[in-house]
Amino acid sequence: MDISFQIQDAVASVIRAPLASPFRIATGQHDELENVFLKLTTRDGVSGYGEAAVASHITGETVPGTLANLQNAAAALRGQTVDDAESACRQFAAAFAGNHAGLAALEMALLDLSSRVRGIPFYRLFAPVAALEPRLAFSTDITVVIGSLDEARATAREFASRGFKAFKIKIGRDEQLDLARVLAVHEIAPDSQIILDANMGFSAGSMLAFLDRLAAKGVRPVLLEQPVPKMDWDGLSEITAALTGSETLVCADESVGSLADARRAIDSNAVSAINVKFMKSGILEGAEIARLAASRGIRLMLGAMMESALAVTASAHFAAGLACFDYLDMDTTFFLKGELAHSPYLDEHGRFDLHDAGPGIGVEPRFS
């Protein structure tokens, strides 16, 4: 049950943070974190925080546009009494059409504030899908970004030594180099799960041929993420059909940014898994996608854009509350420098533990 609160102040601001190294994928790269943050404060001095991670090369959204939308929402919220945070989120949905990262930040801040006012952890806002209890401990994979063979080896060595058991390898620019990189990671961490993320970099035929080459070397990924362009539903279906009964799931990422997309993917048997991200759908619609997929026997990954500890920790709460995700890809803080890289519930081994979580998300970024 919600407790009413009055928002006295609301501010949106762009915050930047350096990366330890460029984050490269098939469709582009990040050289720094440049995200839009929202802070809502009640008349009693309680604050809630939200973050929009804008991935222009994937979604077409922009930082200036997202900032403007959140500034408009902040102006509308000042002085308002919120009786039900979820209803308040839905009232703003139309204003953020085409800007789901901005919507995610607004929802995050309102829900964070609501859970802080109520004195409950953020994960308590999300009822388990099938489990009886929240899942409060789990591990993320680590991403091996597009790069050289030596860089792939270095990442694999470092994170295998920390105890990571799943490596998500970005591919899609150079097939021969990609093959060598995947084999190198497998050689260094032979007992770890291999996830491939093509970020739309292949055709159906070239993807299946690539998988055959890996299989000939004894490497079979547990999951293949977005192998073809997002509107190539026939290509997704072809790959999924070819891999039915194999060890490899086919996961939609860019192809599924809404509940309607998820229905299409499921009804057409185009994929066997879906990657849910706050920045694609917003938080509330993301929960609807997860519930739909779980009800239809579709496996689930929870992912992130280039997000700081705020959004990553919010996603961890989301995963804990819904307790329906098979794969967790929430590793972006390991690529950041500075205080925005620190989540109180994530250790250096990639393990999240929310058993002792306090009210809200538990991360408070500094606003200038």
From Swiss-Prot:
Output this protein's name: Hydrophobic dipeptide epimerase
Task: Enumerate the PANTHER family for this protein.
Answer: O-SUCCINYLBENZOATE SYNTHASE, O-SUCCINYLBENZOATE SYNTHASE-RELATED
* Names of required cofactors: Mg(2+)
Recorded family membership: Belongs to the mandelate racemase/muconate lactonizing enzyme family.
GO function term, MF aspect, one: racemase and epimerase activity
Print the organism lineage: Bacteria, Pseudomonadati, Thermodesulfobacteriota, Desulfuromonadia, Geobacterales
Organism this protein belongs to: Citrifermentans bemidjiense (strain ATCC BAA-1014 / DSM 16622 / JCM 12645 / Bem)
**Biological process (GO), any one:** peptide metabolic process
Q: Give binding positions for substrate.
A: 143, 168-170, 277, 329-331
